[in-house]
Amino acid sequence: MGKETEYKLAVGDLQLLDCILCSRMVTEKLCAPYAYIRMRTTYYDTEDGFLEKRRWMLRLRTEDGRSVVTMKTPGEGHTRGEWEVESEYLDEALSKLAALGAPQELASLQPDALAPICGASFTRITAELRLTDDTACMICGDVGDLTGGGRTALLCELELELKQGNEAALTAFAQELMDTYCLSEQPLSKLQCARALAE
């Protein structure tokens, strides 16, 4: 199974996010300068909420012109199932995701039964951090808008995603950031926040 181990921290203030990304605590761990990636995401589900009932997420995201279809499923703690394929179209991506190990029910869905339900448009400020000799993570500051039901809300959050090594080192770094900047974990995904706008 594809896996993602991630901390998502609510920031809510653009100046605070900039302060965190430029802090010594972060910059002394940078492996390379920050990249700025423009992202546009559309989330899909069936009319009867087939994916929502299972707490699955299916999205089509363009990342600086590159299109990726991603499937995520619940996991334990900060780890989730995640599979992705480079594709501009859901119909060709569903069977490929299932072949990679995503739930097989995905392949049986009719693409025309899936409809956009909400979305997000944001800039991702991202770089790899070296936390310890054997542990690295991606730090991502996401700034933009969530959209759903004709409504829009500000998106401003920080993500830490384990790339290799020890989850305990990632947890310790996330806790250090939370303690230093009075942050809390964001319990809701971008999908959940955007979907709430449409309700």
Label every model-predicted segment.
Residues 1-199:
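Phosphate-end processing signature that detects enzymes handling 5′-triphosphorylated RNA
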